[in-house]
Amino acid sequence: MSFPSVIYGDFGDEKLAQSVKIGGLPLGQLMILPDGSKFRQARAPSGTAIVAGSLYQVAARNSDTMLYKSLIPAATYAVGATSVAFTTGGTASITTNQFEDGWLMIAGSAGSGSPKGEKYRIKSNNSAASGSTTCTLTLYPEDALKTAIAAGTIRIGVVANDYQSPVVTTADTVLDVIVGVAPIAASAGFYYW
């Protein structure tokens, strides 16, 4: 499945909010209106509604740095695989689809032939408690593994999409990248522009 890097909308398109991805488009999809106004598709946090007119920023990054570069795959995965599982560690629990439209990053390994630096788009993931629970990432079929991943030797990381569960920004809470001003109210867990 491929998507245009930019879509062009009409006035009023930015006021749409719904429980499934708008137009089946990925989080972060750019939409430009006739006057040049720009909007990106985002998803409200599962427990918090979006307030129209409020300024939003990227949600706080998980403090468990293991998620970014030190996860060990639960098995060996062949070229063409579209799912990769890892065992959670540290204190981070993972919610369902927390990494939707985010990235699986190959952080590296010992030895030659490492696919270090490769990244793959995440379609979905299951929930997993902290400690020693298995989390399975499902990759988009067109972005299947191009290099095999060997269990126990490769380190991986996961990165959430910037438009997944943004949080409201106030003058004293700017902690990350600003994602924009919500043009409408949206229910918790809904997709919106």
Where do the protein language model's features map onto the residues?
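Extracellular receptor-binding modules and their adjoining Ser/Thr/Gly/Asp/Asn-rich linkers
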Residues: 1-87, 91-96, 115-193
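Extended, low-complexity, turn-rich repeat/linker tracts enriched in Gly/Pro/Ser/Thr and Asp/Glu
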Residues: 110-112
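Short conserved beta-strand and strand-loop elements enriched in small hydrophobics
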Residues: 101-108
